[in-house]
Amino acid sequence: MSANSMSDPRSPNKVLRYKPPPSECNPALDDPTPDYMNLLGMIFSMCGLMLKLKWCAWVAVYCSFISFANSRSSEDTKQMMSSFMLSISAVVMSYLQNPQPMTPPW
């Protein structure tokens, strides 16, 4: 073991520990896309439920998927799962009330 320490050219007094930069100097860490998509998903879910618009319910599912895909693992998953379940329930309720195929909005 002492032979290893004798042949090691690194000096232990020059070792510097890594310190991550603060989040305010790196704007890439504060990406607002998941939050915006979560909010849009909830808005479209409510429009799909209240106005019985199937395309709004499908857009809500799409926004929920984008929000889930762009979120960090450290974020709260309860809000994301509630948004996802709200969008799924909007699709289910809109098709239970009117089982006809969706007509394009244009």
UniProtKB/Swiss-Prot annotation:
This is PAT complex subunit Asterix. One of its GO terms (biological process) is protein insertion into ER membrane. It comes from Sus scrofa. It holds the Pfam family ASTER. GO terms for cellular component: endoplasmic reticulum membrane; multi-pass translocon complex. Component of the PAT complex, composed of WDR83OS/Asterix and CCDC47. The PAT complex is part of the multi-pass translocon (MPT) complex, composed of three subcomplexes, the GEL complex (composed of RAB5IF/OPTI and TMCO1), the BOS complex (composed of NCLN/Nicalin, NOMO1 and TMEM147) and the PAT complex (composed of WDR83OS/Asterix and CCDC47). The MPT complex associates with the SEC61 complex. Residues 1-29 are annotated as: Disordered. It comes from the Eukaryota. It is found in: Endoplasmic reticulum membrane. The keyword Mitochondrion does not apply. The lineage of its organism: Eukaryota, Metazoa, Chordata, Craniata, Vertebrata. It is a multi-pass membrane protein. Disulfide bonds: none annotated. Residues 2-32, 71-74 are cytoplasmic. The chain crosses the membrane at residues 33-51, 53-70, 75-95. Residues 52, 96-106 are lumenal. One of its GO terms (molecular function) is protein folding chaperone. The modification N-acetylserine is found at S2. InterPro entries: ASTER. Component of the multi-pass translocon (MPT) complex that mediates insertion of multi-pass membrane proteins into the lipid bilayer of membranes. The MPT complex takes over after the SEC61 complex: following membrane insertion of the first few transmembrane segments of proteins by the SEC61 complex, the MPT complex occludes the lateral gate of the SEC61 complex to promote insertion of subsequent transmembrane regions. Belongs to the Asterix family. Residues 1-10 have a biased composition (Polar residues). Coiled coil: none annotated. Keywords: Acetylation, Chaperone, Endoplasmic reticulum, Membrane, Transmembrane, Transmembrane helix. Its main location: endoplasmic reticulum.
